[in-house]
């Protein structure tokens, strides 16, 4: 695996065989000392190359997941890696602040619990200009101009 990429560690927890925890668990904020379970949701999207490596404002990376039988979710950690083209066997690391959507409301959501129904989504906007270096900004994922893929890992605690 490339430097900076987190390797998922599959772990059996009874009936939740698809539960994934991250090896770097120590880097997560302790928002809930006794979580029901934590799931890391990998999500990859290809960056469409447009004119001068631009994508429309409002383009969204999103991860939708089922949350049946849970009343709240806490986003514990959000991380992203951008894979450069040509490949250099390395991912550039970015920490993002997510937008958490429940119903019609959208709010900044990290390290706090929120009541949810049966579906939740975490989204990320990317700006128009992709020529700059990879930086982290509020609710925005900026990628380098030679980036072709973005991988997101969202670690959530469901209660």
From Swiss-Prot:
Keyword annotations for this protein, in alphabetical order, are: Capsid protein, Virion
Q: Sorted alphabetically, which Gene3D superfamilies does this protein's record hold?
A: Satellite virus coat domain
| Highest taxon, organism lineage | Viruses
Where is the protein found, in the record's own terms? Answer: Virion
Molecular function via GO: structural molecule activity
What main location does UniProt list?
virion
Which InterPro entries is this protein grouped with? Satellite_virus_coat_sf
A single Gene Ontology CC annotation of this entry is: viral capsid
Something else the entry says is:
This virus depends on tobacco mosaic virus for its replication.
What name appears for this protein in its UniProt entry? Coat protein
Source species of the chain: Satellite tobacco mosaic virus
Q: What is the lineage of its organism?
A: Viruses, Riboviria, Virtovirus, Tobacco virtovirus 1
């Amino acid at each position: 695996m490339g430097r900076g990429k987190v390797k998922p560690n599959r772990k059996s927890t009874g009936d939740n065989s698809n539960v994934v925890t991250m090896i770097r668990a120590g880097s997560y904020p302790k928002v809930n000392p006794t979580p029901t379970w934590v799931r890391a949701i990998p999500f990859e999207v290809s960056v469409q190359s447009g004119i001068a490596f631009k994508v429309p404002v409002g383009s969204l990376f999103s991860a939708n997941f089922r949350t049946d039988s849970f009343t709240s979710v806490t986003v514990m950690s959000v991380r992203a890696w951008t894979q450069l083209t040509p490949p250099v066997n390395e991912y550039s690391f970015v920490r993002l602040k997510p937008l958490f959507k429940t119903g019609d409301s959208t709010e900044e959501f990290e390290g706090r619990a929120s009541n949810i129904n049966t579906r939740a989504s975490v989204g990320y906007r990317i700006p128009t200009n992709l020529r700059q270096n990879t930086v982290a900004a509020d609710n925005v994922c900026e990628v380098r101009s030679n980036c072709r893929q973005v991988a997101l890992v969202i670690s959530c605690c469901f209660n």
